[in-house]
Amino acid sequence: DTDRSRGLGDVYKRQIIGMPVVMNSTLLNCAVVCQKGKILGIVPKTYLPNYKEFYEQRWFTSALNHPDTNIRLCGQNVPVSANLLFDTPDTCFGIEICEDMWAPIPPSSSLVLQGAEIIFNMSADNEGIGKHAYVRSLISQQSARCLAGYVFSSSGFGESTTDVVFAGNGLIYENGSLLAESERFSFKEQLVISEIDVERIRGERLTNTTFAANIGNCPGRPAIHINTEFVNTRDLTLTRPIEPHPFVPQGNELDQRCEEIFAIQIAGLAKRLVHTNCKTVVVGISGGLDSTLALLVCVKTFDKLELPRKNIIGITMPGFGTTDRTYNNALHLMASLGVTIKEISIKEACIRHFKDIDHDMTVHDVTYENSQARERTQILMDVANRLGGLVIGTGDLSELALGWATYNGDHMSMYGVNASIPKTLVKYLVNWIALNGVDNESRITLLDIVDTPISPELIPADEQGNIKQKTEDLVGPYELHDFFLYQFLRFGFRPGKIFYLASIAFRDTYNEEVIKKWLTTFCRRFFQQQFKRSCLPDGPKVGSVSLSPRGDWRMPSDASAAMWLKECEEL
């Protein structure tokens, strides 16, 4: 459209053009990089296919047959090399041509190890049955392996169809993920536009020590760096979608991913039970999402190990804030799943405890709340000891990130099956299991649990018996915190970058002031609550983000959040 064309005008000051180039009485298949009428460099093709319908060696010679050199082209002295890297103020890019990508070690593998963050591939790639999917797989794999952006452009309508057909594929990938693609077999010219997040690429490379280890073993000739002029992109509007729920599988992947996540949880718990020769587990069932998912994992694990479900001891422990809705859902769920049901009220024990510690129980402060959580954990631990069982933890990744757990209360267990699953994903998983993995009676209860407000229920209900203490009113929406968590842990983004992305992802849901408020809360609590994560129980890693102090996240408990909070203030 007109606005986009106006905004992109400066970007077109750099062009990559395919053309044949004569050098030393031989013909090279080349990509020529230009900017503002100046030829910056010529990149010849390295691997020339000479099989089946291809016979490029009839015309061209390989870059391998020529040393890096300079030639005169259009009155300019221009470097010629397959190892050219083009430096911009923001990034660095390299080029390979068509068949180069199909080689066992593509030229791009060497280019990225020498600094390229984006690879451009100019191609004349003809169509065949199933070939398009194969090409997409190649590009995705090379982009993922190189931790790079990959821009692929192939010839289309207008090419000769004497023996083959060209569909005009345009594909943009980033670290293995497709960002944008053209319409195949279009009779019109197309412009495929997206943005590649080079900060994200750099974060991936810093984290991946295998990438760094390969830099010293880089194949091929040393790269030649070419400086390019600054291009103004400030007026560009972001076109790539920013997924507001990055932990949640989308579209056709939902069923497969949910099944895989559930299977990982089951496999983790099964191994622990077999290793300990334990045939009994104890789970506190509140009628909320987390304990529900933990119970479902236990049920499926026992089925897999051919152990009786009666060996799953589900304990509901009503307290001062328990509502009829969650209480009844807990009982109905345990009954429908066929586990052993125990009900132990914590009220009398807590009242006695308040007297022992001289606490006024009309004061609903942190002591009032945490005493209940620790009483429940004590019950679970002691019942497990009596029966020779394991206490299964229910806390999720979002709660661990925010420290929304009572230290040595629900924070503690003998194996935490939900430890790397964020709250937004817990909700989707329970809903998926309700629709795919249980009978109708359990399904009705599960769907009501999904619709129940998230709450620890440590404060008495309101006059109508409804939940008064709603977690998201206190610490903020979990969908925001999970978004912050993903961008912070997965890519190491600063608050400013996270705020920018969140403002786009949630522009129809939250205004910028709300996002800033809860981002500040996230940064403050994440640093403050590390001491709880430093002593977490074992639990299986499920996705790409984990807070295990033994694995993915080793952070001092007294790390300062000052820099992050200062940046939040300046947003």
Model-derived features: positions:
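Fold-independent oxyanion-binding glycine-rich loops
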Residues: G18-V21, A31, K36, V43-K45, ...
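Single conserved hydrophobic/aromatic residue that forms the stacking wall/gate
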Residues: D1-Y12
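ATP/NTP-dependent adenylation/nucleotidyl-transfer catalytic domains that generate, transfer
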Residues: P89, C146-A148, F157-S160, E174, ...
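Active-site catalytic loop in hydrolytic enzyme cores
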Residues: N24-Q114, G130-L138, F166, F187-K188, ...
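Conserved acidic residues
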Residues: K36, E117-I118, K279, G389
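Generic structural signal for hydrophobic
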Residues: D3, L111, Q142-S143, L273, ...
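Active-site-adjacent helix-turn-beta-strand microarchitecture at beta-sheet edges
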Residues: R14, N24-L27, V33, L40-G41, ...
